[in-house]
Amino acid sequence: MPRSLKKGPFIDFHLLKKIEEIKQTGKKKLIRTWSRRSTIFPDMIGMTISVHNGKQHIPIFIGDEMVGHKLGEFVPTRTYRGHSADKKIKKR
């Protein structure tokens, strides 16, 4: 179920504070975050944010088509290694 419109989009305060600091200084700095639940705002466009997938931080470059989505949508948490191969040998 989507979030109520009267509540507005969610972003963690510590992440918002880091984004505002980088916007003021104008530096290109990588932001590391564990907040996969935060919504991508238009202020984040052009930044690189490193999002934790449970094992390591994966950097993602924020584009304009990502606005409104969550950070966790772009970093998969599970790796698919494929199904086990069929090991039967055919006899001729």
Curated annotation (Swiss-Prot):
Similarity-based family: Belongs to the universal ribosomal protein uS19 family.
NCBIfam families: rpsS_bact
Protein name: Small ribosomal subunit protein uS19
GO biological process per UniProt: ribosomal small subunit assembly; translation
Entry-linked InterPro entries: Ribosomal_uS19, Ribosomal_uS19_bac-type, Ribosomal_uS19_CS, Ribosomal_uS19_SF
An example Gene Ontology molecular-function term: rRNA binding
Domain of life assignment: Bacteria
Lineage: Bacteria, Pseudomonadati, Pseudomonadota, Gammaproteobacteria, Enterobacterales
Gene: rpsS
Protein function: Protein S19 forms a complex with S13 that binds strongly to the 16S ribosomal RNA.
Keywords: Ribonucleoprotein, Ribosomal protein, RNA-binding, rRNA-binding
Record GO cellular component, one term: cytoplasm
